[in-house]
Amino acid sequence: HFMIKEIHEQPKAVSDTLNSVIKDGMIDLSEVGLSEEEIKEISQIYIGACGSAYHVGVAAQYVMEDLVRIPVRVELASEFRYRNPILDPKGLVIIISQSGETADSLAALRESKKQGVKTLGIVNVIGSSIAREADNVFYTLAGPEIAVATTKAYSTQLIASYTLAIQFAKIRGQITEEQYTGYIEELKTIPDKISRIIEDKERLQWFASKQVNAKDIFFIGRGIDYAISLEGSLKMKEISYIHSEAYAAGELKHGTISLIEDGTLVIGVLTQPALYEKTLSNMVECKSRGAYLMGLTTFGHYNIEENADFSVYIPKTDPHFA
């Protein structure tokens, strides 16, 4: 029940996090601690995290590279800490953790500091170890999260990452003033869009009741949709105890598609217009092998119903933040 409660708290958590850094229509990172000069000097961004926070990092990598035009590497903190990483002294290491106490993430932070690289923690718990030890801190204002499976903390971590990407892009001259204002306005619409999605729960509950005996579930997507698929699959495992995997849709043909048989549930995530047709063709390929298809896309892409057995639509959003 805590999880249901926290799902419904997402709009407020996202809104609170945005309001903490958006002042008079502009992003203000003064409380985070990074100066404009420091942001201009960053040569590369490294992101370390575990679990759902790692999936945030995967999404952030796509957005930051596209907007900021800077190399971004995202890595599991549990791998990063043991492999003696080579870090650029002018790089920035971003560590994402809800609790701020995740052991592997904390170790990755300490390794980065040992190498003299600037660090930034995206954390939810004020005064936590990562918050204390990182050079800079972006607090997500999700409030206490009791459920084991993260919901509102995950959403606020995404928003924090997107906010950083927009501000970095502006400071480094990669986007115009008009784009900057547009992206900020787009972020401000997200809490209301989350509310609308949550209200549309009856169809999803009906669908879930029909699929309750599924043995294997595959989530597929491309680009940011792949990052979302990773999180969707983890949630499916954590909450339903049903075996689930996430794949970049283009990788299905390299062996995985042989696991799809009659009735296998395949959930396609298609929020990226430029990749929509590609992912749809992967879904059609799955259907030819007997898969039951669910499509998750934005309003307007109604042709998905020609192939998907069940479709879910979410409000249109700038593809970076979908």
How would you describe each model-predicted region?
Residues 10-14, 18-46, 136-265:
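Active-site phosphate/pyrophosphate-binding segments
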Residues 40-189, 269-317:
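Glycine-rich phosphate-binding loops that contact phosphosugars or nucleotide phosphates
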